């Protein structure tokens, strides 16, 4: 396993005692992403020559696809993000099979296989996930306390360029309105504005899905958490100029 130092990825792997090699931090600019691509490819190539894998498996990883192609090994990719055009272009030509949800809106030809469901069901279906009530105590919440999760993303992915979510002013007004009726927690991928620090959600990242399950409402810029809430049965509002087939289908299904 190789993992980029992004958000809580390394912390999750550490908490589950899963061994991995860090690829370091990614970059936000296009030129920075290009040089990081070269760095990550070389790192993965070095590791692969030592480990000698029979198969590369990734979630839309250009690095895994490039190195698998160099070594003549098959690469299987999963993705559910149609609008990640640059990312798709970087891995698809070097990938043997790409799996997507059935409602994925793009077609990638003969190597494209679809499955009935959403990516988030791989870990949030009833046979994989059971909500834990103890997380409420960790947040000093009582069973009947109503709380809302607001999620802010970093906007550093290649497909985020030119797009945005909440403005600072709108976010402050939104929090002011919600906290008249419920407790507000901010889940933030980047830096929290200083005047909103008191709302930041401080938790063990392994608890996040239990917290989302118990939330009264989720409002966020992140598609993954919005989809997770749909699976968990928590009402969610997705705030983003980008959409995805999975989210649109979940809305149609009243999830």
Regions from the PLM with identified roles:
Residues 1-2:
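N-terminal subdomain of nucleotide-sugar transferases
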Residues 5-109:
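Active-site and donor-binding regions of nucleotide-sugar-utilizing enzymes
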Residues 5-6, 15-27, 150-152, 172-204:
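Catalytic donor nucleotide-activated moiety binding site of glycosyltransferases and closely related
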Residues 16-22, 73, 110-120, 194-205, ...:
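Active-site regions of enzymes building and remodeling cell-envelope glycoconjugates
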Residues 40-44, 189-225:
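Donor nucleotide-activated moiety binding/catalytic core segment of transferases
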Residues 54-55, 97, 147, 183, ...:
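Structural motif
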Residues 55-62, 67, 77, 208-249:
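A donor-sugar binding/catalytic signature common to diverse glycosyltransferases
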Residues 99-164:
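A nucleotide-sugar donor-handling region in carbohydrate enzymes
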């Amino acid at each position: 396993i190789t993992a980029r130092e992004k958000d809580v990825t390394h912390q999750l792997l550490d908490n589950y005692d899963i061994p991995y090699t860090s690829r370091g931090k990614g970059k936000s600019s296009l030129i920075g992403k290009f040089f990081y691509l070269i760095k990550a490819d070389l790192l993965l190539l070095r590791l692969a020559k030592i480990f000698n894998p029979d198969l590369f498996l990734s979630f839309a990883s250009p690095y895994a696809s490039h190195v698998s192609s160099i070594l003549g090994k098959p690469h299987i990719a999963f993705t559910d993000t149609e609008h990640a055009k640059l990312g798709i272009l970087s891995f698809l030509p070097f990938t043997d099979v790409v799996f997507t949800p059935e409602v994925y809106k793009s077609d990638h030809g003969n190597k494209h296989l679809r499955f009935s469901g959403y990516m988030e069901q791989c870990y949030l279906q009833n046979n994989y996930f059971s909500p834990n009530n103890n997380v409420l105590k960790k947040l000093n919440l009582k069973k009947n306390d109503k709380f809302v999760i607001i999620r802010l993303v970093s906007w550093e992915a290649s497909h985020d360029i030119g797009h945005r979510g909440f403005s600072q002013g709108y976010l402050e007004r939104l929090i002011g309105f919600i906290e008249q009726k419920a407790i507000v927690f901010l889940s933030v991928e980047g830096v929290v504005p200083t005047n909103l620090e008191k709302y930041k959600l401080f938790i063990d990242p392994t608890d996040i899905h239990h917290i989302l399950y118990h939330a009264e409402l989720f409002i966020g810029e992140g598609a993954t958490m919005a989809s997770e809430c749909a699976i968990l049965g928590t009402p969610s509002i997705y705030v983003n100029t980008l959409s995805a087939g999975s989210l649109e289908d979940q809305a149609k299904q009243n999830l």
